[in-house]
Every structure is written in structure tokens, then in C-alpha cells.
């Protein structure tokens, strides 16, 4: 009887020990899960996933169940009508209230909203023409801080300066990269330069001196009917972009030092008679794509659609793309940012992350709209997308995406934009038609006029 009670006590103790062990194991498991939940989410990881059983799925560390409403101002209605429905498939509880705003009116509308305290968008775009002015307003959030935790290291190497303000804060991501080379008419290149192959043309035109000499030959062979670059401002855009470097320090603008070298090459082209008489983005310039009186044009990833297809719709197979002599440059471009005083920062970031950074969003944004993001991982993970090409490749008989990324991106540099960059560009635009026509004005005289025009628009600045 005593032995039976003893055996029963041992069984009871054994059962209790097993129960305690199970409870402790469960606590350890729950504690581990709690540690995972409180860790900082990575806002740059790709793919929709659930972190643990029973948890809501995330995209880039952002819960896809996130709720809220954001205001977006954009000038590309086709982008909005395509991407917003795709975004809502992943983030169904977010309402995107968008307004189509002309890019020429964007900055004025934004400044009016900020000044009056009326509606300001949560997601703000910054076209290159006014990006420095926008960044200097100090109304954009630093994307390397909470709640975004995006790192500059993820960007293509030339982009951080172009997406940072003068304090060094990363305040935007790229809507679509804009490394640029030279697009050219294959028929004219073959007739006047002897080849339409981009590699052979690069060998034939290794620098701008060779380009000018060949341009003189083209002028003579065509009786002056065919030029190398369609406009004075097109040539300036290339030459200035290739020599990108900081030249604005606070309110001091080192204009002479910055522009001397590109101006020397630009005016040499003018004096050699190899530039067309058009002004960029005028009706005549647009018509020249199909007319066939000019060989080369600055060409960024957006140009085949908006310049070639739009102006030469019958030009399938007529075009080529090559790196410019002496290197690549940026041509246009738009930053995408979060308003510093937004009440829906996490939701705004979800929109930006999906549309411009995630593989899920880029499957539509790149494949349907042709936009290439500015992050290294896209090109590392989706080389097959680039190799598949786009419908615009038929105009060039070559893979445009690979040409831009492989041949041009490695040579591109960028610099931080300020409000004075916009002023410098405005001053140039007011003067270059005169410089095109009046060949008595040389480099030194033009630089003096340039400095005076900038000073008139920025009297508080020191112009050197």
C-alpha cells in the first residue's frame, strides 16, 4: 500500500515536470516572437511576406493592412491611372487622392499651398528644372530617418547628390533614371559618317575634337543641309552635363570656372557650323526628327517615347543610341518626396516604395510604362527584364535599357541642386538665341553676359 502511494507520487511529479517544461518552452517561443515584432522593419526589403504565423503580410517592411488617405500631385495622368489601381491591390485600405498638375505650374501651386496653409500633397514631385528651388524650401522629409529608413547606399552611385539637399539629407527617390547619350539617325550616320553601328561610331568619335572635325566633313558633303546636333542648347545640355561638378557654395556662384570648358567646346561647334538653327522643343526642332536634316540628339530613357516616337512615328528602325563622346550625362529627371508636415508619412512612403522601388510595383512601372528605378537591386535582380527589351526598341534596332545601363550609367555624375541652378538655367535660356546668331560674341564675352544675367536675377549672390 505504501509502495503504491509512493509510485503514484512519482507519477504525479513526473507529469508536473512535463507540464512545466512545456510551459517554459511556450514562453520561450512567445518571447522570441515578441523580439521579432519589436525589431526595426527594413523598409527596403523586397517582396510581400508574413513575418510569423498569424501576422499580417508586409511589403518592404510596411504592413499591407496599413490604412489612411494621401494626396498626390503628379503631371503624368497615365502613370496615375495605371499605378494607383496596382498599388491598391497590395494596399487596399489606402485611399490615393490625386490631382494632375502641369509641371510648368507645379512649383507655383505648391508654394501657394504652403504659404496659405491650404492643401499640400503628401507626395511631392521635383522636376529637374525646379528641383533645387524645391529642395531649398526645406519642406521635404529626410528619407534616411524614421519612418522610412531608406539608405543612399541602395541608389545608383551618381544619384545621391541629385536627390539630396544642401544639408546632405536624402529627400527624394528617382521617378525614373535619366542617364543620357546621343540618339542618332541611322540613315544619315551611314551616309555621312560611313557607319550606323554604335560601337563603330564611338570609335570614330572618341572626343569632341573628332566630333567637330567629322561635323565639318558632314557639312561639306551635304552642302550645309545636314548638321551634327540640332540646336545650340542641345549641345550645351550635353557638354554641361558631362562636366557636372559643385560650383555653388551658399550664395557664391563660381560661374566662370564652371562654364569655361563647356563653353569653349560649345562655341567651337557653333563657329565650325555643325549646329542646327533650331531651338530645343520648338515646333521646328520637333519636326526635325522626321525631317532628316540633323544626325544627333541628346537621348535619355524617356526620349524614345516623348521625342522619337512622338515626332517620328514612322521611324521604326531609323534610330540608334550611343554613349556621347567624353562620357554620359543626366537629362531631365524627377524626384519623389514626402512632405515634411504630412500627417500620413507611413502611407505616403508605402505609395512611393510600391510605385518606385519594389519589384511588385516595378513589374508594372517598368514593363508597361518604361520607367527604370534608381536602385541597384533592380538591375541585379531583374536583368532578364532588361534583356527582354521594350516596344520602343523597334525604333532603334537595339536594346535601349541595356545600352543606357551598361554603356552610359557608369560614366554619369551628379551634383546637388539649389535654387541658383534654376536661375543659372533661366539666364542661359534668355541668352543662347543671341549667341547662336551673333558669332562676334566669343567665350569670354558670353561669360560676362552670363554672369550679368545671373546677377540680375540673384542680386544677393556673389557671381564669379
Give the role of each language-model region:
Residues 64, 305, 329, 334-422, ...:
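Mature extracytoplasmic/periplasmic domains
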Residues 64-77, 94-99, 122-123:
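Short, well-ordered beta-strand elements
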Residues 107-119, 137, 189, 210-218, ...:
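Short helices/loops that flank or line small-molecule/ion binding pockets
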Residues 89, 97, 149-153, 164-234, ...:
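Helix-loop-helix "hinge/cap" segment bordering the ligand-binding cleft or interdomain interface
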Residues 86-156, 169, 191-193, 288, ...:
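Extracytoplasmic "Venus flytrap"/periplasmic binding protein-like
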Residues 47-62, 127-181, 209-212, 316-323, ...:
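Hinge/lid segment of periplasmic solute-binding proteins
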Residues 57-59, 73, 81-88, 234, ...:
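Extracytoplasmic/periplasmic substrate-binding proteins
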Residues 1-69, 452-464:
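Short, low-complexity disordered leader/linker segments with a strong preference
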Amino acid at each position: 500500500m505504501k509502495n503504491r502511494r509512493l509510485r503514484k507520487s512519482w507519477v504525479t511529479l513526473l507529469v508536473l515536470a512535463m507540464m512545466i517544461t512545456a510551459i517554459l518552452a511556450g514562453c520561450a517561443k512567445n518571447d522570441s516572437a515578441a523580439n521579432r515584432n519589436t525589431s526595426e522593419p527594413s523598409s527596403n526589403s523586397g517582396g510581400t511576406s508574413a513575418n510569423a504565423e498569424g501576422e499580417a503580410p508586409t511589403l518592404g517592411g510596411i504592413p499591407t493592412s496599413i490604412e489612411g488617405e494621401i494626396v498626390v500631385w503628379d503631371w503624368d495622368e497615365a502613370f496615375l491611372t495605371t499605378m494607383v489601381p496596382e498599388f491598391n491591390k497590395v494596399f487596399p485600405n489606402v485611399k490615393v487622392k490625386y490631382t494632375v498638375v502641369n509641371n510648368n505650374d507645379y512649383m507655383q501651386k505648391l508654394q501657394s499651398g504652403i504659404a496659405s496653409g491650404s492643401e499640400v500633397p503628401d507626395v511631392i514631385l521635383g522636376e529637374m528644372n525646379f528641383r533645387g528651388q524645391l529642395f531649398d524650401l526645406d519642406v521635404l522629409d529626410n528619407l534616411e530617418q524614421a519612418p522610412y529608413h531608406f539608405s543612399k547606399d541602395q541608389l545608383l552611385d551618381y544619384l545621391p547628390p541629385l536627390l539630396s539637399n544642401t544639408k546632405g539629407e536624402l529627400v527624394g527617390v528617382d521617378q525614373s533614371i535619366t542617364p543620357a547619350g546621343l540618339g542618332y539617325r541611322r540613315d544619315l550616320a551611314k551616309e555621312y559618317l560611313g557607319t550606323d553601328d554604335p560601337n563603330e561610331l564611338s570609335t570614330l568619335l572618341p572626343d569632341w575634337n573628332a566630333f567637330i572635325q567629322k561635323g565639318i566633313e558632314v557639312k561639306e558633303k551635304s552642302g550645309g543641309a545636314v548638321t551634327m546636333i540640332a540646336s545650340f542648347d542641345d549641345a550645351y545640355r550635353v557638354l554641361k552635363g558631362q562636366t557636372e561638378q559643385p560650383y555653388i557654395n551658399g550664395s557664391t556662384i563660381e560661374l566662370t570656372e564652371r562654364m569655361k570648358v563647356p563653353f569653349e567646346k560649345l562655341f567651337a561647334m557653333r563657329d565650325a557650323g555643325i549646329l542646327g538653327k533650331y531651338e530645343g522643343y520648338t515646333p521646328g526642332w520637333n519636326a526635325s526628327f522626321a525631317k532628316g536634316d540633323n544626325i544627333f540628339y541628346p537621348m535619355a530613357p524617356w526620349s524614345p517615347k516623348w521625342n522619337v516616337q512622338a515626332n517620328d512615328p514612322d521611324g521604326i528602325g531609323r534610330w540608334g543610341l550611343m554613349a556621347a563622346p567624353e562620357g554620359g550625362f543626366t537629362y531631365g529627371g524627377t524626384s519623389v518626396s514626402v512632405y515634411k508636415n504630412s500627417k500620413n508619412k507611413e502611407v505616403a512612403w508605402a505609395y512611393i516604395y510600391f510605385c518606385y522601388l519594389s519589384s511588385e510595383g516595378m513589374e508594372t512601372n517598368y514593363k508597361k510604362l518604361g520607367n527604370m528605378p534608381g536602385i541597384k537591386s533592380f538591375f541585379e535582380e531583374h536583368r532578364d527584364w532588361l534583356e527582354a527589351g521594350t516596344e520602343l526598341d523597334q525604333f532603334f534596332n537595339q536594346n535601349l535599357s541595356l545600352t543606357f545601363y551598361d554603356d552610359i550609367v557608369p560614366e554619369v555624375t551628379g551634383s546637388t541642386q539649389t535654387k541658383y541652378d534654376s536661375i543659372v538655367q533661366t539666364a542661359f535660356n534668355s541668352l543662347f538665341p543671341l549667341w547662336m546668331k551673333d558669332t562676334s560674341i566669343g567665350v569670354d564675352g558670353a561669360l560676362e553676359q552670363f554672369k550679368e544675367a545671373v546677377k540680375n536675377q540673384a542680386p544677393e549672390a556673389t557671381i564669379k
